[in-house]
């Protein structure tokens, strides 16, 4: 890669959450293997982010690569309208087998945000088919569900990612976020805000949507499983369907295959993405019950009105099948448990640091919440120079490493975080 390529990128390519007038530096990765990203200067970085939660088995995994190569010899893509193919059928079988018995209808899409859009549209059509024009959704503060319009509308409007669009988005209902954390005692007052809203608006609410147990970039909070149980009880009482957004947490990240298993509850609609293909290629899925699917199909329109061009892409489905095969045959639960134990041991002592207000660990997720805002450019440079890739935001330094990371390599990640806290110039 030449210097002119770098200059071209700087001038013409818009990266996520970046300015074209004053873009943050981008670091050129030329290859990746295992937990390592190789830079153009031939140096290596330990990936602490799994490419935004996705690469759970690391990079260049032979089983995933083999699945891609085998499929591409047959076909890389074919439209899914009026056509089906073995990789999609096999994947949907596996997803139905992995998830609770109730979820037996699968809609495939090409990104997590689209999976959320699909879930929301499903419930709007569901109520239309029942003769009710419900379009209001209830969710909780500090939530994040993606960057497309419907996904933004059910994300916390106080979230700085979406504030600029607030007046343009559909208005929904937001209950207070739970205060009871995952490992602390349950406080029954946590459910009161949600209960009050659902009691007052039950006849208008099309559905409830939330991230089970782990709230992602809305604040990286881990809330008590009892909150999820109480929500499901209330929703069942008022016959309001529940959407669980497991796009970030699905496929083992919290120590369970799906985060909702911590509460022993089942959603009416489940959204999956990110690590569904082991971080190899983009794919997402929205699963729902036969009842919801049949109700939509019996409505005035007679079908569900959605169909992405790359829906059910054979390459993506093939590698997703391989990813699930790995999860069924390897020791991912032990891997995640070992990561969790080490993160507790390495990160929890940082709670005594003057720049730290909280430390949170669950499964293969570690979060250090700082008392001061982070200087993104400075801290990113510090991390890269120290051989790790960590992408903080706001006041949060968090890691979600690949499950295959070794104890020695994970220790380096956490040591660099600890060292960063001692650099005052990295904070604002």
From Swiss-Prot:
Entries under Pfam families matching the protein: Aminotran_3
Reaction(s) catalysed (UniProt annotation): (8S)-8-amino-7-oxononanoate + S-adenosyl-L-methionine = S-adenosyl-4-methylsulfanyl-2-oxobutanoate + (7R,8S)-7,8-diammoniononanoate
N6-(pyridoxal phosphate)lysine sites (modified residues): 274
InterPro entries assigned to the protein according to its UniProt record, in alphabetical order: Aminotrans_3, Aminotrans_3_PPA_site, BioA, PyrdxlP-dep_Trfase, PyrdxlP-dep_Trfase_major, PyrdxlP-dep_Trfase_small
CDD domains reported in the protein's UniProt record: OAT_like
Keywords assigned: Aminotransferase, Biotin biosynthesis, Cytoplasm, Pyridoxal phosphate, S-adenosyl-L-methionine, Transferase
Pathways involved: Cofactor biosynthesis; biotin biosynthesis; 7,8-diaminononanoate from 8-amino-7-oxononanoate (SAM route): step 1/1
Binding site for substrate: 52, 144, 274, 307, 391
SUPFAM superfamilies reported in the protein's UniProt record: PLP-dependent transferases
Gene Ontology terms describing biological process: biotin biosynthetic process
Residues holding pyridoxal 5'-phosphate: 112-113, 245, 308-309
Location in or out of the cell: Cytoplasm
GO molecular function, a single term: adenosylmethionine-8-amino-7-oxononanoate transaminase activity
Cofactor(s), names only, from the UniProt record: pyridoxal 5'-phosphate
Main location: cytoplasm
Record EC number: 2.6.1.62
EC top class, as a word: transferase
Annotated positions for site Participates in the substrate recognition with KAPA and in a stacking interaction with the adenine ring of SAM: 17
Disulfide bonds: none
GO cellular component: cytoplasm
Protein family: Belongs to the class-III pyridoxal-phosphate-dependent aminotransferase family. BioA subfamily.
Role, per record: Catalyzes the transfer of the alpha-amino group from S-adenosyl-L-methionine (SAM) to 7-keto-8-aminopelargonic acid (KAPA) to form 7,8-diaminopelargonic acid (DAPA). It is the only aminotransferase known to utilize SAM as an amino donor.
Subunit annotation: Homodimer.
The name this protein goes by in its record: Adenosylmethionine-8-amino-7-oxononanoate aminotransferase
Annotated source species: Buchnera aphidicola subsp. Acyrthosiphon pisum (strain APS)
Lineage: Bacteria, Pseudomonadati, Pseudomonadota, Gammaproteobacteria, Enterobacterales
Gene name of the encoded protein: bioA
């Amino acid at each position: 890669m030449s210097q002119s390529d770098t200059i071209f990128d700087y001038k013409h390519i818009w990266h996520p959450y970046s300015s074209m007038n004053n873009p943050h530096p981008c670091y050129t990765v030329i290859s990746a293997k295992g937990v390592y990203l190789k830079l153009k200067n031939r140096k290596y970085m330990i990936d602490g982010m799994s490419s935004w939660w996705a690469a759970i088995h690391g990079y260049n995994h032979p089983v995933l690569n083999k699945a891609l190569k085998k499929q591409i010899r047959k076909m890389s893509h074919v439209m899914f309208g009026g056509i089906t193919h073995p990789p999609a059928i096999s994947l949907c079988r596996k997803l139905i087998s992995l998830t609770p018995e109730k979820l037996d209808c699968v809609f495939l899409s090409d990104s997590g945000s689209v999976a959320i859009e699909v879930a929301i549209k499903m419930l709007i059509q569901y109520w239309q088919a029942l003769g009710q024009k419900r379009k209001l959704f209830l969710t909780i503060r500090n939530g994040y569900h993606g960057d497309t319009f419907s996904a933004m509308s059910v994300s916390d409007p106080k979230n700085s990612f979406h504030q600029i669009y607030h007046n343009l988005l559909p208005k929904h209902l937001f209950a207070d976020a739970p205060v009871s954390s995952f490992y602390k005692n349950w406080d029954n007052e946590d459910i009161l805000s949600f209960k009050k809203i659902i009691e007052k608006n039950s006849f208008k609410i099309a559905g409830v949507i939330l991230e089970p147990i782990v709230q992602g970039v809305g604040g990286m909070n881990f809330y008590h499983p009892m909150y999820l149980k109480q929500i499901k009880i209330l929703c069942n009482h008022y016959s309001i369907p529940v959407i669980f957004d497991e796009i970030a947490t699905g496929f083992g990240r919290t120590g369970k295959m799906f985060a909702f298993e911590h509460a022993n509850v089942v959603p009416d609609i489940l959204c999956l993405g990110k690590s569904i293909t082991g971080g190899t290629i983009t794919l997402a899925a929205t699963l729902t019950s036969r009842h919801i699917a049949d109700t939509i199909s019996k409505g005035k329109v007679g079908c569900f009105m959605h169909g992405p061009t790359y829906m059910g892409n054979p390459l993506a489905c093939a590698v997703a099948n391989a990813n699930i095969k790995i999860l069924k045959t390897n020791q991912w639960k032990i891997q995640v448990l070992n990561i969790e134990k080490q993160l507790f041991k390495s990160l929890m002592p940082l709670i005594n640091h003057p720049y730290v207000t909280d430390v949170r660990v669950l499964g293969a997720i570690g979060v250090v919440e700082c008392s001061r805002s982070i200087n993104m450019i400075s801290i990113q440079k510090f991390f890269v120079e120290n051989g790790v890739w960590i992408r903080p935001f706001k006041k949060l330094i968090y890691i979600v490493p690949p499950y295959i990371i070794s104890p020695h390599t994970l220790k380096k990640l956490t040591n660099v975080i600890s060292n960063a806290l001692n650099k005052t110039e990295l904070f604002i």
